[in-house]
């Protein structure tokens, strides 16, 4: 794989980022001013402030990154707002349902579900997240096949999506199936992290690829008080011979990322191409690990428009969830090396997998990409393409994952900085200064979808008569030689023809 060393920045420029957040439409500008306080607007202005400190510019790490492999028009707030008029989804329904598949009610399932539920309720503040009773995959009419790159069977997503659609609760805003089984959406694809059914607000995601190095051996159960405070302990998977495997904190965070990513798409948010964001697509496990656990300001405004929470309250809830998670895992993984943006583990499928992120017009979610090893694509768009973390050419993860507690601690410190920024008193003059500085900048040139105009060559002012005469004589001589050869060849052919007759 071609790596960019160091990673290259990708940005649309401050002016475009400001328009994506606030919009050029007068009504949407007024909506922005009325919906947020001055401190919230200054916080959100980090999206387009060239001196931002809380949010980061997108980085391209390889030539196979999702951003380069899936070029599409980014979804700004104005586009998102217009798409809501086409959706039949009713936000009067305040329940998100998680449907476990082959997750038992014992230690193998409940702690994981409790972690995901508590994270989702903090992330989607104002919505209630409920867990449905677990169902067996054998009771679902879905196809299966042997996995191509791992041991075990893979489940076809279409059968699961049909089951979720037919069994969707009446008060459900959306339903997301969760499974530890590997999934595949199409025979030509190796696997997918997630998929959804447009127009029905049902989806399914798999945590199968967050196993192996994401698991740590363990025989003890965390303190019961912490389990109660955090709504569950580390996920445990019973193994043959009585051995127990537990998700590391990093593995649990990845499961939370996938779940919240999928739920955002089910609520109507499209993929993000503006800043580093949870709603970025991924084409490899490396990209999934680098993706942050929260939204950029542009996507945060979209979610705020749907749910109407206060930004400060949401970040405080996420901070509480992160603190409890840290208390549960601190000490268990203290001896592991740390993982940072620059020292991420390298996987064999890096840059060769595929998350889906080509959104249909009627849905903000992305279709999954075919097997990147063969680079074969199915004919026509997939009618049920869901968002995506689809990684199609993934093989075994050949990395040593470490420092998951450090990753959670870094997220907690970032939440601290967000809370401090939102608690600060801000005057309108400070906002005016930031906006004026950005408005004074020129717009960056971007591809408009039109090919460049053919360059017109101006005639030379000075015409060299001597050179033109020499070239003319040369070409005339060449023409005479070619003509004489053609005549000689034609006469020779006639002689041969007469001799044969």
UniProtKB/Swiss-Prot annotation:
GO biological process: proteolysis
Cross-referenced CDD domains: Peptidase_M54
InterPro entries from the UniProt entry: Archaemetzincin (IPR052009), MetalloPept_cat_dom_sf (IPR024079), Pept_M54_archaemetzincn (IPR012962)
First-tier enzyme category under EC: hydrolase
Source organism, top-level taxon: Eukaryota
Entry binding sites for Zn(2+) 1: 261, 265
Disulfide bridge positions per record: none
Protein residues bound to Zn(2+) 2: 272, 277, 296, 299
Disordered as annotated region, ranges: 349-370
Keywords recorded for this protein, A-Z: Hydrolase, Metal-binding, Metalloprotease, Protease, Zinc
Cofactor requirements of the protein: Zn(2+)
Zinc as UniProt keyword: yes
A molecular function (GO) term: metal ion binding
Keyword Transferase: no
Listed EC numbers: 3.4.-.-
PROSITE patterns, sorted: ZINC_PROTEASE
Active site: 262 (proton acceptor)
Cofactor: binding details: Binds 2 Zn(2+) ions per subunit. One is catalytic, whereas the other seems to have a structural role.
Protein family according to the UniProt entry: Belongs to the peptidase M54 family.
PANTHER family noted in UniProt: ARCHAEMETZINCIN-1, ARCHAEMETZINCIN-2-RELATED
Purpose: Probable zinc metalloprotease.
Name of the protein described by the UniProt record: Archaemetzincin-1
Organism this protein belongs to: Rattus norvegicus (Rat)
